[in-house]
Amino acid sequence: MGNVTVAWEDVISVIQMVRTHLIVIGAALVCMILLMVLARRWAKPLRGFIRWQSFIGFLLITVIVVNVMLIGALNNTLNVVLADRGELSQENADNSRQVIEEITNEGVVMTKNDEDFLPIEPQKINVFGWASTNPIYGGTGSGTVDASTAVGILEGLENAGFETNTELSDMYREYREDRPAISINDGQDWTLPEVPVADYSDTIMENAKAFSDTALIVLSRTGGEGADLPHDMGSIMDGSTMDVGTKYLRGSYTNNSDEYADFEAGQSYLELSRTEADLVDMVCSQFDNVIVVYNGANTMELGWTENYDQIKSVLLCAGAGATGFNALGNIISGEVNPSGRTADTWVRDLTQTPYYNNIGHFAYTNTEDVAAAAQADGIVSFVNYNEGIYTGYRFYETAAEEGLINYEDTVMYPFGYGMSYTTFEQTMGDLNVTEGAITVDVTVTNTGDTPGKDVVQLYYTPPYTNGGIEKSSVNLIAFDKTDILEPGTSQTLTLSFDEEDMASYDTYGRRGTS
């Protein structure tokens, strides 16, 4: 059996699972002790008999409860711990690291590249932002990554041939070494560590400008199981979120300065903090060529990147795993041509999203019968899903067609959006229908001067009758990505789907119609 590492959160979780069983054993122990004490009142033969019987009774209850625990609540845990473990070969480990890097090669999304600023040759580069020294590698809970052995953003840049400004990175590490924990069991610390602009001395900035005329700003946001992202940071900072719970619904935030608050009431976690906004202002006032890297899986408000002519390029890089940040360096250098696409719609103002009022920390007030069993110290929480079929891009595309929103004013980056260092042309062939299966050929030609991959996305618009079955105006039904295409070369992709894939469900008449 291989080495088993145990995290404190795992211990807490196991204790919570068997809490009722432990209470039963504890009650049996108390009863045994009471009987042994009371037995002192009886004569010696009876006293001994009662004590032995109480001990045997306690032992029997303990054995039964422990067996129930092992068969029930702890069954899966024991299987994980006691099961035979295979050894991971070095070859498989190396292959896994390579796969992680390849996934990031395919997934990083470039959303802005004014003046074709990227790619740039490996050179000296100033990397600003505390997150550059402590990036997001994955989600929370089961999505965590061992950061101690992972390739970070700075290391990924250096592996690609860039030289980073160590005076900046040393300052960030000295400011704070660890990332605030978003814990399932111990509450959530939503603090966004960032060195206040006032702490950047004239010497540091003069040295940075002498080091390189190019700056890269890294901003990150974490998120995962255990808590919704706060949409009112003011309530997090003033502690009012504590009113509805003490565990899953608990949140805290520590400001980066005593001179101001990082967030005002009503601002969400996915907006720039005051310290981050000051950092962007400072960097853009000192450097003409700025790259922004957003490291996070959630759709942050990025409209501010359009307010600075100095911000030439924007890259979206979610949790990159153990080795994925090598890909980020390779994309900036041009070793890899970005081909990722957005997996959600990025909006300019999150308060205008259809789900905004239905997310957050909502708690039931009439659940006394189940509250005792709730993990959140008696708090039973919920989230409302009211969007129906209009989730993600389906809402924005349909709302724009119906005149409910102005698409350009609302949407920052559409679903399926992403830029490349080259250009492509796509030519769609005729639809072929055979026994309910539909295929179509799409020929992609690299019309630029740089090798790269392109993504073909096939959408359909179903017929809609006012008052009929709800249907979104645009629906993704198939997609594929080309191989690396050299300039002037083409590749034909065949996309296929079934007619049934375009069917709609009548939730009121309970009958499927196409």
Language-model region placement:
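C-terminal non-catalytic regions of proteins with extracellular/luminal or membrane-system context
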Residues: 1-514
